[in-house]
Every structure is written in C-alpha cells, then in structure tokens.
C-alpha cells in the first residue's frame, strides 16, 4: 500500500467530480472575504468535536485538488496548509484565488462543505483633481470668489469603490456632499468665501470595507472692494515721517510698494504698507506713491499718493494784558502735511523751554489752531516774547509774539475829566453869548399859579454902553474906507441917545398897566431907531 499509495488518485477524483456536480445545486454554506497580499483561512463546516479525514478542492471547470489531511498527499502549492487538521489556510492571496472551495470530510459518513472566497483589492492611489484659479508656492489651492471650481476623485479598487466627498469649514463639523457609485465628479459654481475649507475624497471598498481618503485645502480669495488709502504722519517717539498705506476688505492681505515721485525710486515694499523716512529723505512738496497688488486683483493694481508740505504760521505779533487780568495768545498753522506739532516757548526768561500747562498757563489745541491763556498777568513774570513753534519732519517754523503787561486804567478819573471839559466848554460858550448879546430880557412870574406876587420887568440902558457907542461913532467917522461896513453894523446895536430911563412896573398882577408900559417902550425904541437913520443920512 505504501509503495502504491498514489496509484488510486485518478479514480478518486473522477468519483469526486460526479459527487460535486450533484452537490453544487444545494447551495453554499459560507462566504469568506480576503484581500490581495493578505492571508485567509477557510473553515470546513461548523462541526465541533472529533473530525475525520479532510480534503480540500477548488471548483473550476473541474475540481482541482489542493490539500488533504492525509499526509501521503502533498499540497498543490506551498501557500496551502491545514489549520487544526481541517481548515484551509492560504497565504498571499491574489485575485486569481477568488472562487468556490469544497471541503470533504470522511468519518462515519462523508460530508461536503463549500466556501465562497471573494478577494478584494484596494482602494489604492487616490487621485484628487481640483481645477481652481491657482496654486500657492506651498501647494495650497486657491480660487477667486465667484469663479467655478471642478472636483474629481479616482481610485484603483476591486470591486470599484464608492466615492464620497466631505467638506469641513474652519471651526465647524464635516458635512457630506453625497456619494455615488459611478460618478466621482462635481462642480461648484460661483464659489463664495463660506466654502473655503478642507475638501476630503473618501473611496470605500464595499467588499473589504477598507477605505482611503485624501484631504485638500481650498482657499477662496477676493480683492478689497474699495480703493486704497494712504497718509503720512509723524512717528511716535521719534522725529521721522511714517508713510502708511491701507487697502482693507480683501483676502489675503495685499502687497504694498512705496515709490518716490517723480523718478520712481523705490522707498520700500512690504505686506504692512508702512515705511519710515528720515529728514534727509524729505523736502517740501515731495510726493510719495503707494502701489498695491492682490493675488486675484486687477493686474494693474491700485494706487494712492501723498504730498508732504512744511508748515506756515499766522498769529498776532503783539498782545496787551492788564496786571491781574487774563490774556490769550493764538497761533494758527496752515499748509502742513503731515500735521505739525505746536509748542509754546519763552525766549527771555526761559529760553528754549517748552511751556507746560499749569494753574497760570492753559494750552488748548483744536486741529492746527493752538491757544495759550495766561491767568493773573504779571509784568515781572509774563511780559516779553513768546514763541509759537510748529514742528514737522518737513520743516520747523517759529513766530514771536510780544506780550505787554500794563496797569489797569482809572475809568472814574477819565469820566470826571470828560465831564469837566464839557462843563468848561459850556461855560465858555455861555460867556461869549452873554458878552456879545445887546438886550437881555428876564421874565419873572407865573400868573397861572395864582400867587400874590409882584412881577417887575425893567429895561436899563447903562451909561457904559452909551459911551462905547459914542466912541464907535467917532471911530467910524475917522475911517472913510470903512464907513460902509460900519454903517451896516450900526443898526444891529440899539443906541440910547436921549439917556432916558424908563421903568414900567407891574404890581399886584396889573396886566393892563403892564401892556401900556410895554407899548410905550416899543414906541420909544422906534423913535430912537428913526433918529439913528437920520444921523446916518447926514454927511460926515
């Protein structure tokens, strides 16, 4: 038997073929899934306890012997071995190992068990393609806002994998874009910033449940919506000029290039848009241009320009303050860009020492207008020159203001003097009027009061006036060339040639006598005037 142990094998295979052909229609008892390059174990039924002789076959067009527990039968390949004297162990699976395997067990009776081995492969080499606007130097993809982005994912797998896309925005959970067994391509139209994040392609082998995934970051860029803004200012803590350029509202931050105009000399380039210039680089009227560029912005970019100018000062050259009072000195700066820093100094008592706010000095500034208010003026402390200085990196300007401190005026004395002068003038005018008036008339009394008073009206021709008139007549006769003028002036005087003194008195309100007396006086005056005319007619 030992010598001819291998002789009966052909007859056994023929019998097994006939038996298996009738058994296949019964159905399979187990399905085992393995993966390429992995190992798998196929069990012979579900029986526990004492087992008989086991032989494994593979069902192709005809049964193929693989392995038997009979030590006299060698395995078909070294990859095949028995585990626990019943199970078939296959090493390093390949896609060709997939198929139906049959186990024959001979104990008291012969039993047959079938196992279906399925071999899965992959997914391997997932390839993700995202067609976007561009790629950064580090490999990160970016898309311009409002553009179209195409996504595709490919993987080698058996059976073909199920492809699923996942999206995760910043600081949020993942969400699925759906899965498909056949289509692994989709597009996003008019992409927006809220779709910026990580896109993951997941390929799943439904047979082996093995999956692979590839995550790709996609950034959504957009330029600022408005024009850039630039300005100049004094740097804090130093006497330098700071140029600042801003172009806000875009992502990512743009690039800034400062150049000097005209000439195009590059001042500096940075992501911050800030450049520092020393005084040696500055001059009145010089222009600086900021040129901005964005990765998805217009190719020509955008720009803005600043022009620096030195300050000019305007102030009152002289101010006056009364002792104990208050005075305000003003200083106005115009034309300065960037705005100048305004300082107040003394050039007499405290040369080049900046005046600081105190209880006596109040400094206020509104824009480019500054005021210095001095309280409780003192001639010893406050009188003198004050300097208003405008400091700017472009230039320094100074203006001197003279403050004069005086004693307050005596208002009462001034008013008294004016009143005295008015009274003196009135007295002089009254004296002149009294001196040159020929006739005076005083009316005394008031008949309406009904008082019992004696009212007297008196007309008096003094001896002195008569003598003066006679002298004037004699002088007129001497000067023949002045005769005519003297004759014109003579009627204005009332001569008293008859030297008659008339007195009319009204006593106890006798109105009738007063009227008669007044009439007699008028008659006498008329006679005197007629006598004067007759004398004028006589030859001299």
Curated annotation (Swiss-Prot):
Disulfide bonds: 44-103, 153-201, 245-290, 331-388
Pfam families reported for this sequence: Ig_3, V-set
Lipid bilayer topology: Single-pass type I membrane protein
Record-linked SMART domains: IG, IGc2, IGv
GO MF annotation, one: cell adhesion molecule binding
UniProt-listed CDD domains: Ig, IgV
PROSITE patterns found in the cross-reference section: IG_LIKE (PS50835)
UniProt subcellular location: Membrane
Keywords on record: Disulfide bond, Glycoprotein, Immunoglobulin domain, Membrane, Repeat, Signal, Transmembrane, Transmembrane helix
Presence of the UniProt keyword Lipoprotein in the record: no
GO cellular component: cell-cell junction; plasma membrane
Compositional bias of kind Acidic residues: 461-477, 521-534
Compositionally skewed regions (Basic and acidic residues) per UniProt: 482-500
All copies of domain Ig-like C2-type, residue ranges: 31-119, 123-215, 223-309, 311-404
Extracellular compartment residues: 31-413
Signal peptide extent: 1-30
Stretches of the chain found on the membrane's Cytoplasmic side: 435-540
Transmembrane found in the keyword field: yes
BP terms from Gene Ontology: cell-cell adhesion; synapse assembly
Residues carrying covalently attached carbohydrate according to the record: 39, 46, 70, 108, 138, 171, 180, 198, 326
Region (Disordered): 461-500, 513-540
PANTHER family for the chain: CTX-RELATED TYPE I TRANSMEMBRANE PROTEIN, DPR-INTERACTING PROTEIN ETA, ISOFORM B-RELATED
Name used for this protein in its record: V-set and immunoglobulin domain-containing protein 10
Organism, as annotated: Homo sapiens (Human)
């Amino acid at each position: 038997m030992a010598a001819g142990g291998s002789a009966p094998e052909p007859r056994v295979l023929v019998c097994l073929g006939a038996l298996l052909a009738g058994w296949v229609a019964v159905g399979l008892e187990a399905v085992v899934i393995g993966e390429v390059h992995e190992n798998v174990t196929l069990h012979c039924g579900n029986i526990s306890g004492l087992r008989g002789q086991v032989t494994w076959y593979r069902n192709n067009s005809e049964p193929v012997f693989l392995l038997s527990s009979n030590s006299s039968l060698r395995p078909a390949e070294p990859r095949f071995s028995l585990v626990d004297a019943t199970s078939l162990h296959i090493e390093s699976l390949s896609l060709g190992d997939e198929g139906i395997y049959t186990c024959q067990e001979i104990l008291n009776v012969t039993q047959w068990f079938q196992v279906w081995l399925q071999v899965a492969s992959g997914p391997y080499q997932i390839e993700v393609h995202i067609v976007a606007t561009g790629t950064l130097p580090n490999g990160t993809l970016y898309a311009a806002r409002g553009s179209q982005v195409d996504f595709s994912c490919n993987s080698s797998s058996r059976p073909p994998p199920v492809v699923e896309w996942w999206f995760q925005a910043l600081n949020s959970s993942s969400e699925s874009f759906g899965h498909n067994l056949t289509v692994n391509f989709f597009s996003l139209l008019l992409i927006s910033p809220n779709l910026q994040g990580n896109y993951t392609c997941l390929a799943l082998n439904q047979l082996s449940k093995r999956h692979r995934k590839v995550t790709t970051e996609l950034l959504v860029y957009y330029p600022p919506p408005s024009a850039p803004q630039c300005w100049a200012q004094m740097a804090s803590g130093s006497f330098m000029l700071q140029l600042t350029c801003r172009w806000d509202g875009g992502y990512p931050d743009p690039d800034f290039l400062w150049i000097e105009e005209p000439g195009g000399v590059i001042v500096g380039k940075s992501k911050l848009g800030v450049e520092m210039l020393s005084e040696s680089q500055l001059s009145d009227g010089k222009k600086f241009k900021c040129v901005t560029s964005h990765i998805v912005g217009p190719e020509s970019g955008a720009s803005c320009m600043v022009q620096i100018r030195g300050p000019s000062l305007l102030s009152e050259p002289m101010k006056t303050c009364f002792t104990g009072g208050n005075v305000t000195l003003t200083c106005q700066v115009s034309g300065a860009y960037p705005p100048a820093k305004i300082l107040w100094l003394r050039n007499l008592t405290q040369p080049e020492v900046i005046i600081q706010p105190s209880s006596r000095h109040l400094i206020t500034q509104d824009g480019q207008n500054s005021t210095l208010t001095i309280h409780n003026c003192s001639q010893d402390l406050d009188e003198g020159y004050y300097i208003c200085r405008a400091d700017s990196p472009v230039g320094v300007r100074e203006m001197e203001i003279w403050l004069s401190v005086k004693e307050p005026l005596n208002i009462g004395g001034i008013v008294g003097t004016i009143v005295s002068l008015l009274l003196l003038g009135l007295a002089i005018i009254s004296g002149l009027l009294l001196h040159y008036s020929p006739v005076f008339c005083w009316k005394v009394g008031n008949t309406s009061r009904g008082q019992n008073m004696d009212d007297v009206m008196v007309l008096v021709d003094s001896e002195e006036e008569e003598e003066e008139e006679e002298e004037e007549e004699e002088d007129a006769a001497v000067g023949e060339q002045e005769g005519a003028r003297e004759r014109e002036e003579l009627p204005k005087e009332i001569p008293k040639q008859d030297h008659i003194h008339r007195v009319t008195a009204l006593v106890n309100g006798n109105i009738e006598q007063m009227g008669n007396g007044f009439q007699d006086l008028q008659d006498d005056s008329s006679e005197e005037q007629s006598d004067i005319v007759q004398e004028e007619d006589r030859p001299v």
